[in-house]
Amino acid sequence: RLTENITSKRVNKVLDLCAGSGIQGICAANKANSVTLVEINHQTIPFIKFNILLNNVEDKVRIEEGSLYEPLGNETYDEIYTNPPFIAVPKGWNFPIAGNGGENGLDIINKIISGYRKHLNINGQAYMIGEAIGTEKEPFLIDELRKELSNDFKITIILDFKFSIEAHLRRSSYVAIGMEKMRGDDADNLFEKYKDWIKEVNAVFVYNYYLKVEKTKQGQGSIEVIDMTTTWSKNDIPVLINDKDYQIQEFPQYYAICRNGKVIAQLDEATLKFIKKIDGKMTIEEIYQNLCEENKNIVNYLPKVEAIQSLSEACGILKVRNIIEKM
């Protein structure tokens, strides 16, 4: 999604932090005089070099191996792109470096946004996507933005959708278990063990967000929160939007909903079966019960309450993708 927001406006210098494969910076090289990619994971560097050569941008793009701004000295940039590690991970979990955002998910993100003051030019812009835990009202990230940047930066944050912190923790439990190469049923034990962590961080939801920050003159900052999230309950009735206007394609690991030849959503098999049952009459709970009667294996790894909650959260994502709406 971050690459979709790379504009065609010509700029001098672009920075891609937490570069990963380097895709953001490589795409930005088409409109920039120079691009710097920063990546801390040494194992990723050969892949970045390959992608640079593959796209014939080696004359514009340089790689710096290190942590965030540390290799950059006092360099400043016109644009900064970041897809950072943002997953909130309780202490003691063995979790992939690519996703581990610390106990509240903001360890890396706070360092990134605080660096905008030093490394972003006046009228320069920074873009970030990710997930952030928060209260029922908003993610904790917004409070950090207010404290750190709101006086001298024009901030726009779009909240796409939100899902329960419990669902986030269960998903993270399975990732952590995979890292430890333990039995799959241990994920349930780990999930129960870390329910206390949910209370400690005082989080209710996980928010998916898109952030744009523009450096202004001193004292001319502002913050705008665009909340597109909607909470679905078991009693809501989903309705398909222009169901004849899209196609479903099957891939080895997932299904894709396409409209006008463009993928607008990726689905697992359970969500696809759920969508096919939407008739504009049944509630989410009724669809779940209908699916259970037809297929005993449908989301059977979750208790009923959590399974319905998972489908409700899927409805929030499908609503953002303009696939369904509430009756």
Predicted regions and their residues:
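A generic alpha-to-beta junction signature in SAM-dependent methyltransferases
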Residues: 72, 119-120, 278
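A mobile, often basic/glycine-rich helix-loop segment
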Residues: 92-111
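Long, charge-rich, low-complexity alpha-helical segments
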Residues: 34, 263-327
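Rossmann-like AdoMet/SAM-dependent catalytic core
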Residues: 153-273
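Residue-level signal for inorganic ion chemistry
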Residues: 2, 83, 112, 287
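Conserved SAM/SAH cofactor-binding pocket of Class I
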Residues: 1-73, 79-82, 88-89, 133
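Conserved Class I SAM-dependent methyltransferase catalytic core
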Residues: 41, 106-161
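Short amphipathic alpha-helical segments
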Residues: 49-50, 92-95, 113, 139-142
